[in-house]
Amino acid sequence: MKKILFLSALIVGTSFFATAQKEYKLQYSFKKGDTYEWSQSASSKQHIVGPGFDQNNETVVKTNAVMKIMEVTPKGAKFEIEYTKLSTSTSNPQTNIQMDSEGDTAKNLPNKIMRAMKGKKFNFTLTKDGAVESIENVENLWSGLTAANGFNETQIVTMKQSLENSFGKNAIKLNLEVAMVRYPEHKIKVGLNWNSKTETGTPIPLKTENVWTLESAEDPAATVVADGQITTTDTTKVITLPPGLRATTNFKGRRVVKSHINLGTGWPETSRAYAEQKGFMVLLAGGQIPEDMKMDVDVNIDAEYAIKKK
């Protein structure tokens, strides 16, 4: 009986050890012509305190897009992407603006602008490891904002400035990087970590040092978590904010992303991201700003992403 018990324990222990030690080579699979539906829902809440004021701002962005693989390369793939639905809402003590590509455009200029951005194609490249290497032809998003479509020059300039933070090149790259899991070059086991780094300007120059973990894996699915430390890369860099204000920034924070992936294809199916940043910006003297003005800023961002192959 003791021998039987010993053999049973040995079999169970060996089975557990084999399962725990299983290795996975995580990477994206690409095929020319494959098409994916991508959806994003993100909210950003800002608490700003400055000389004589205390203000809360909130921005909500929701988009649906179609991504098509146009070319497969040894390193990855080149995609063509276009928005099929866009909406944003911005609220603060001074204003409340709703913009919806599916809303009435006859009397609503913001809706008309969103509608004009639908179907405008641009490109990005993605490596097998999940690095977003380039964003190209983003200027096509604004190609519908023309006099022929009923927009005057002032409207075009003003709206492009206000939408740059959500739909500019840097913002799009950041959203793709958060939605796409970054994989290691080597094989990985459950519970082990790997690192990646991203740098973006939105327009604030930020760097995120990510520690990724394969939290769980059971064919055909797995869960991956990224825990990232956010810092400002250049606290002396002067950035431009709407409507033409100049400022320097200094932020630190944390971003956590949890993604459910397909082990066979490497593609994330759903992702949830949360980020918090704290610090300050200094509005530089000039125009309506008589002297440098320091403002303490807290930012909380909550975002969800979903990707589905058509």
Language-model-detected regions and their locations in the chain:
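Bacterial Sec-dependent N-terminal signal peptides
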Residues: M1-L26
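Signature of exported/secreted
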Residues: Q21-K310
